[in-house]
């Protein structure tokens, strides 16, 4: 992802306070209700990227999105871009690539390489990355706990595409975070393979967070935040 920020004057700024004299768990300050997010979806500012806070955030329909020059920004947009696995759209050209086994796809083989590539890949219209070293470290910890998952797309021994996200397995919801591709169609190929896998596992919904025409072309759609939160209940 990546965006320029405009904070509405009406924004309710919620600062997480930390007290070093209190242990980590008892000092944990909860997120405000998602209904208090501003019109752009910005809900809260501040706090640390601990495993506990991140897991709590995703289970509440909240995700971090900011760049290295900013404090941690927490978002819960309305509407929410999602993909229902059964609504996946696969173009004729992609079907041909899949039929011909154009790439090899693996899962959780090299999470660290995937998130590093997502951070470093050049994206049109972006001068930097939101996947900071802090983000990479936090999500690597989540991966080690089995919560963050990766998809790798290979051309021989070369990693040419991939994506990663958070798997709320108990809720049958996968929250996509970022993808990259160094050759044409590699990330899309990996995404299609992931959706097929998740569909077989009974996943109800893939959270795509915000609208893009690319996601819409794959079958994703916008639903209300209220409807989205129903899948996390």
Describe the function of each predicted region:
Residues 6-233:
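N-acyltransferase acceptor-side catalytic subdomain
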């Amino acid at each position: 992802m990546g965006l320029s920020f405009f904070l509405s004057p009406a924004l309710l700024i919620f600062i997480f306070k930390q007290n070093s004299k209190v242990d980590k768990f008892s000092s944990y300050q909860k997120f405000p209700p998602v209904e208090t997010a501003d019109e752009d979806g910005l809900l809260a500012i501040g706090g640390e990227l601990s495993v506990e806070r991140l897991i709590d955030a995703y289970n509440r329909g909240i995700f971090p999105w900011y760049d290295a020059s900013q404090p941690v920004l927490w978002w819960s947009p309305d509407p929410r871009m999602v993909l229902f696995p059964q609504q996946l759209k696969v173009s004729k050209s992609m079907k041909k690539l899949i039929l011909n086994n154009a790439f090899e796809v693996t899962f959780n083989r090299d999470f660290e390489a995937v998130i590093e590539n997502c951070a470093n890949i050049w994206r049109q219209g972006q001068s930097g990355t939101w996947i900071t070293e802090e983000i990479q470290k936090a999500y690597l910890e989540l991966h080690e706990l089995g919560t963050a998952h990766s998809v790798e797309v290979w051309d021989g021994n070369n990693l040419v595409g991939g994506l990663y996200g958070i798997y709320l397995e108990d809720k049958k919801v996968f929250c996509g975070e970022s993808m990259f591709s160094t050759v044409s169609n590699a990330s899309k190929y990996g995404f299609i393979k992931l959706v097929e896998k998740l569909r077989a596992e009974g996943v109800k919904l893939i959270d795509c967070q915000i609208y893009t025409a690319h996601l819409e072309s794959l079958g994703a759609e916008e639903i209300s935040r209220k409807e989205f939160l129903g899948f996390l209940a």
